[in-house]
Curated annotation (Swiss-Prot):
Family classification: Belongs to the glutathione peroxidase family.
Gene name of the record: GPX8
Protein name (record): Probable glutathione peroxidase 8
Modified residue annotations for N-acetylmethionine: M1
PANTHER family: GLUTATHIONE PEROXIDASE, GLUTATHIONE PEROXIDASE 8-RELATED
Cellular compartment(s): Membrane
Organism per entry: Bos taurus (Bovine)
Keywords, in A-Z order: Acetylation, Membrane, Oxidoreductase, Peroxidase, Transmembrane, Transmembrane helix
Length: 209
């Protein structure tokens, strides 16, 4: 019996070569398409381009806050920092609100499970106990694969991920993060930064007239 290698294997031919060429062309086309998606896809560079849910679960656009200065905060009702921070946030909102500024609060239960309430109850709690008048949105997740995209944008932009409740992100009128604060930092540190950003915004608007 002759060895198998004595008989050459016929593994190629005109049809096989044509198929290989066609397959290569298809793969190249797919790769080019994927590269186009990667490089041509518009990069989101503004917090105000996102949609979120309000406390009632309705989808709302953050576009309405474009052109304003915003202080975005992850809040919780049953935290040792709750009283001090809610009072300080309301004070800032009341002081600077007339000058195109708003506090935007996002309840989260990922830090010590300190926000067990449904979103509507969070709003009632904050209003009844601290006189809060700024927007409080639907309860979200901040960490992990289910993180709210709008908040993820703040984290990725600033390279500052919350480690507890009441982290604060100062967002300019164009939707970019310009400053962050940890929960224990006092309002006296935050106030001048907000005032300076509002001042810049007002000057720019006057120059554009």
């Amino acid at each position: 019996m002759e060895p198998l290698t004595a008989y050459p294997l016929r593994c190629s031919g005109p049809k096989a070569k044509a198929f290989a060429v066609l397959l290569s062309m298809v793969l190249c086309t797919v790769m080019l398409f994927l590269l186009q998606l990667k490089f041509l896809k518009p990069k989101i560079n503004s917090f105000y381009t996102f949609e979120v849910k309000d406390a009632n679960g309705r989808v709302v656009s953050l576009e309405k806050f474009k052109g304003k200065v915003a202080l975005v905060v992850n809040v919780a009702s049953d935290c040792q920092l709750t009283d001090r921070n809610y009072l300080a946030l309301q004070e800032l909102h009341k002081e600077f609100g007339p000058f195109h500024f708003s506090v935007l609060a996002f309840p989260c239960n990922q830090f010590g499970e300190s926000e067990p309430r449904p979103s509507k109850e969070v709003v009632s709690f904050a209003r009844n106990n601290f006189g809060v008048t700024f927007p409080i949105f639907h309860k979200i997740k901040i960490l992990g694969s289910e993180a709210e995209p709008a908040f993820r944008f703040l984290v990725d932009s600033s390279k500052k991920e919350p480690r507890w409740n009441f982290w604060k992100y100062l967002v300019n009128p164009e939707g970019q993060v310009v400053k962050t604060w940890r929960p224990e930092e006092p309002i006296e540190v935050i106030r001048p930064e907000i005032a300076a950003l509002i001042r810049q915004m007002i000057i720019k608007k006057k120059e554009d007239l």
